[in-house]
C-alpha cells in the first residue's frame, strides 16, 4: 500500500508540474503579469513570463507596510481596492477577483483584472498570496475581434 501512495504522490507532483508549465505558457501568450507575496518575509514580486521563465521582475520589500508608496501613482480607489482584497486573502485560504488601475513601467494607467489565491501552510495559516493580472483592454480587444 505504501508503494502505491508513493507512486500516487509522484504522479501528483508531475501533474502539478505540468499544470504549472501550462500556466506559464498561457501567462506568456496573454502578456499577463504574475504576483507573488510572501507573508513571513513581507516581500512581493511582480513579473511576467518570457521564454517560460520569470522576467522583468520587480521586488517590493516590506510590501504590506509600503503599499501606498509602491502604488502612489495609482488612483486612491485602486490602492484601497487592492489593499482590501489582499487583506481578505491573508485572513484565510481563498480566491478573489477584482479590477483596479495599475501604472505600468511606461507610466501609463492600465485598467487590469486581477485574480488572487491565498496559499496555506501545513497549519492552514496563509503563508503566500499569488495572483495574475492582465490588461482589461487586451481582453476586450480580443473579444471584439472574435465578434
Each model region followed by its residue ranges:
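PAS-associated C-terminal cap
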Residues: 1-20, 134-147
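PAS-family sensory domain signal
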Residues: 15-71
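Short loop/turn motifs at secondary-structure junctions and domain boundaries
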Residues: 26-29, 91-94, 110
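PAS and PAS-like sensory/regulatory domains
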Residues: 32, 96-98, 105, 110-114, ...
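PAS-family sensory domains
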Residues: 37, 101-107, 120-121
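PAS/GAF/H-NOX family sensory domains and closely associated sensor/linker modules
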Residues: 58-62, 69-81, 88-94
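Short loop/turn elements at sensory-signaling interfaces that couple input to output
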Residues: 114-129, 134-141
Amino acid at each position: 500500500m505504501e508503494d502505491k501512495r508513493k507512486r500516487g504522490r509522484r504522479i501528483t507532483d508531475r501533474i502539478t508540474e505540468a499544470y504549472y508549465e501550462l500556466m506559464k505558457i498561457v501567462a506568456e501568450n496573454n502578456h499577463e503579469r504574475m504576483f507573488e507575496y510572501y507573508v513571513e518575509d513581507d516581500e512581493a514580486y511582480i513579473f511576467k513570463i518570457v521564454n517560460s521563465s520569470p522576467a522583468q521582475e520587480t521586488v517590493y520589500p516590506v510590501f504590506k507596510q509600503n503599499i501606498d508608496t509602491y502604488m502612489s501613482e495609482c488612483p486612491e480607489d485602486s490602492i484601497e481596492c487592492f489593499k482590501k482584497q489582499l487583506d481578505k486573502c491573508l485572513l484565510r485560504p481563498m480566491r478573489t477577483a477584482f479590477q483596479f488601475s495599475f501604472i505600468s513601467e511606461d507610466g501609463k494607467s492600465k485598467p487590469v483584472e486581477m485574480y488572487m489565491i491565498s496559499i496555506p501552510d501545513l497549519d492552514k495559516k496563509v503563508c503566500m498570496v499569488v495572483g495574475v493580472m492582465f490588461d482589461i483592454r487586451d481582453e476586450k480587444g480580443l473579444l471584439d475581434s472574435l465578434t
